[in-house]
Amino acid sequence: MNTVRVTFLLVFVLAVSLGQADKDENRMEMQEKTEQGKSYLDFAENLLLQKLEELEAKLLEEDSEESRNSRQKRCIGEGVPCDENDPRCCSGLVCLKPTLHGIRYKSYYCYKK
């Protein structure tokens, strides 16, 4: 009976010590895989960033081409404050100093001609 106990104890000690070694190896392998995964993620992130920058450049180029070919579409309506130096009143309107209600605001408004 003692030999069975000694054999069992010996097998148990070997299993525990080898298990610890395997655990350390597994931990090191996981650490290496994590580091490799991080480098892969960094590479993928940089690639995605480059693609996004290219797309943004294309969109900005298209937008600038559009703005060169288009005229100003928005204008200021009647009775809306305007700047006397840069009037953006709609066609048929003129930027004038008001006669009554705008006097206290000291501003110009778009009025019909």
From Swiss-Prot:
Propeptide part(s) removed at maturation, as residue ranges: 22-74
MF annotations from Gene Ontology: sodium channel inhibitor activity; toxin activity
Q: Where is composition skewed (Basic and acidic residues) in this entry?
A: 60-69
Which Gene Ontology cellular component annotation is one that this UniProt entry carries? Answer: extracellular region
* Disulphide-bonded residues: C75-C90, C82-C95, C89-C110
Q: Where is this region: Disordered?
A: 60-83
Signal peptide residues are: 1-21
Pfam families referenced in this protein's UniProt entry, alphabetically = Toxin_22
Briefly state the protein's biological role: Probable ion channel inhibitor.
Domain description: The presence of a 'disulfide through disulfide knot' structurally defines this protein as a knottin.
Which family is annotated? Belongs to the neurotoxin 14 (magi-1) family. 01 (HNTX-16) subfamily.
Q: What is this protein called?
A: U11-theraphotoxin-Hhn1t
Lineage of the native species? Eukaryota, Metazoa, Ecdysozoa, Arthropoda, Chelicerata
